[in-house]
Amino acid sequence: MKRFFFLCAVMAMAFTASAQQSWVNETYNPQANTEGLAPMGARVISPEVHDNHTVTFRLVAPNAQKVVVRGTMFTGGMEAKSAEMTKDDKGVWSVTAGPFTPDVYTYTFNVDGLSIVDPANTLHNHGTMPASSMLYVHGDGPAYYDPNPNVEHGSVTTSYYNSTVTGGLRTILVYTPPHYDPAKKYPVLYLMGGSGEAADSWYKYGQVNWIMDNLIAEGKIEPTIVAMVNNQIVHRSSPNHSQLSFKMMEREYKECIIPWVDSHYSTITNRKGRALSGLSMGGRHTQYIGFRNPELFGSLGILSAALTAADEKAFGEDAVAMGRDAKALKDAAFDYIFIG
């Protein structure tokens, strides 16, 4: 189970996108634009990522008065810093910024006070909040979160189940490792996203399938099933989100998710065969559900899970229940990791 430590730490650094600019091959440098071709319907190439790790951004906006690009590549925060763009005589705004550390970032254009995605960039994230554009600053070769043509690859399946908690149809994505064999038993990592993310975010932007393929090929983890769970169980803007979300997700796991996964895949069905992890809100769900249910999970990965005042209140209301289970927690001997 200690291998889950390594897996969770790796995934915490890799919330990235999995599509590509050219739509031809899965590659580690999808925005290098080696062919010099703009996407169909676009008038400019943007972003254009250069081998020296600088990036050229372009936007056609002849009537705009001011355009800036804002993104996580500058400081790690969307609004903290920006690069002002200049307009040429054809109405094309541009700026070359960087060099940036090879990684995956998000950015937007601000046009006269209006925030928009890059219309020439085919890679956008999506979820339960406004979209932004994805930026790949590639290194000299594939990173641990990139597709690698030299390793074997698993599969990702999108499925649906009926929830007794929400009373509706819910989405779940499941990664199975290369050469998945129903005659064998596999450990399961249950993985959740943050408050603004969709059910498929860990697949499309976290690239968990590439990460798993690479780690399995390197022998750093055993072949593992990953169940990517939709933890958007209450509308994020609901004033009762924190009070309802934790208990509802706990029920969802116990009544729906774990029984569904165990009945559809060849799994190890004891706590040592299950790990629970999540980013941000998913980390808070992990902390709440995992420590309250030590009989279900043997490993926990709590990633960037700062508690809000409302979260603390929700946790506090269950302090008696958690105290009641103190002996169970002591006997459980969790493997767990906190990051960020």
Region locations from a protein language model:
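Bacterial Sec-dependent N-terminal signal peptides
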Residues: M1-S22
